[in-house]
């Protein structure tokens, strides 16, 4: 048979792919065995330290819950209708059961209701607020008791572009002065 025989070419390709997949699989097995001591226990997610808090490296975000799809106002509305406070609590409880221990939210009546319900149901989830209004820092802390407040990135960019970086600094200082972790 010549190398132009389609049966031979297909067979050679299959053999090559089989050898590659076997090599990859054995390499993955060796790598997994070598780093098994570095991995969290089954069912746990990796975490990082933020101050005195252990935060899962995956956090539950606010955009879908708050109705921010970046796909237009119709999708935003559908998301807001779907993520009722009760569904949001169920979603966050499911996240917590899977090892996600932190929820990043924006201040709103809905988030206040959801965080209160989570705590009433015994959740150990930690709450990280994303905000930009210095005037609302105290009220946000009183209403939702986050462990940290970060200045919203889009607002930060806008303020820096307008030469108002001092306002971002003042926001961070306000959060720190109230005893919370602060970020930008």
Task: Please annotate each region the language model reported.
Residues 10-15, 26-43:
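N-terminal twin-arginine translocation
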Residues 115-123, 138-146:
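Acidic (Asp/Glu)-rich catalytic clusters
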Residues 86-108, 144-147:
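Catalytic domains of carbohydrate-active enzymes, especially glycoside hydrolases
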Residues 71-85, 127-133, 158-161:
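Active-site mouth loops of central-metabolism enzymes
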Residues 60, 182:
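Conserved, mostly hydrophobic/aromatic
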């Amino acid at each position: 048979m010549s190398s132009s025989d389609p049966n031979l070419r297909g067979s050679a390709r299959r053999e090559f792919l089989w050898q590659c997949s076997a090599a990859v699989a054995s390499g993955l097995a060796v790598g997994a065995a070598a780093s098994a001591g570095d991995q969290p226990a089954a069912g746990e997610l990796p975490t990082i330290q933020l101050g005195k808090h252990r935060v899962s490296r995956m956090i539950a975000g606010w955009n879908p819950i708050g109705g921010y799809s970046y796909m237009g106002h119709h999708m935003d509305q559908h998301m807001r209708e779907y993520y009722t406070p009760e569904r949001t609590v169920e979603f966050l409880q499911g996240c917590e059961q899977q090892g996600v221990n932190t929820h990043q939210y924006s201040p709103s009546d809905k988030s206040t209701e959801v965080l209160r319900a989570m705590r009433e149901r015994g959740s150990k989830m930690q709450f990280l607020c994303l905000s930009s209004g210095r005037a609302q820092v105290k009220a946000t802390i009183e209403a939702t008791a986050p462990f940290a407040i970060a200045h919203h990135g889009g607002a930060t960019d806008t303020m820096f572009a307008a030469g108002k970086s001092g306002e971002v600094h003042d926001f961070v200082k306000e959060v720190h002065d109230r005893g919370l972790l602060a970020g930008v």
